[in-house]
Amino acid sequence: MCIRDRTVNPQVHCGAYGFNLGDFQGGQAEYLFVPYADFNLLKFPDNDAAMEKIRDLALLSDVLPTAFHGLMEAGVKVGSTVYIAGAGPVGRAAAAAARLIGAAAIIVGDYDKERLDLVKRNGCETIDLSQDIPLADQIEAILGVPEVDCAVDYVGSEAHGIGHEAHELQPQAAINQVLAATRAGGATG
């Protein structure tokens, strides 16, 4: 939304608002900066109808579709074992969606203990990545095998290392964890 008008553009992929346009953060904030808003945004056809459903529209515009798309890309289905890298809003939405899909086991890894507590209270297994324990060992302690059927990265380029490397920004860390956590013949998203 912009301050003067309620707007949306279904033609713009969310990737356009990533690091390629600079450090514009706050897509889930009350206000955000949209580069090139003069052509990136279109008015809602019916502003009053949009405002009545704004909470539903906000959820469907970013967090849940991103979470669900990652699960679909990874081939999550009934009975799958799933590793979710990241317990932020998108990772938590993915954990809830994986449960609705019927995943047999949902494991969420993160450094933030409060976020991990949230997903644990919702029935997921958790992995505290600040511990100096290899991810495969932590997965094996939960499942009895060191790998999952499907894994998805909901961290991206803000990833950090595991354990004693947790203070270091390592953009490749989350995707490397996802790849290492997935069994041969499994899939990632």
Model-flagged regions — what are they?
Residues 74, 117, 121-189:
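Glycine-rich cofactor phosphate-binding loops and adjacent beta1-alpha1 units
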Residues 37, 111, 156:
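Flexible loop residues that form catalytic
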Residues 4-42:
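Glycine-rich phosphate/adenylate-binding loop and adjacent beta-alpha elements
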Residues 43, 49-132, 137, 152:
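Mid-domain Rossmann-like dinucleotide-binding core that forms the NAD(H)/NADP(H) cofactor-binding site
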Residues 22-23, 97, 142:
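A general structural signal for stabilizing positions within well-ordered secondary structure
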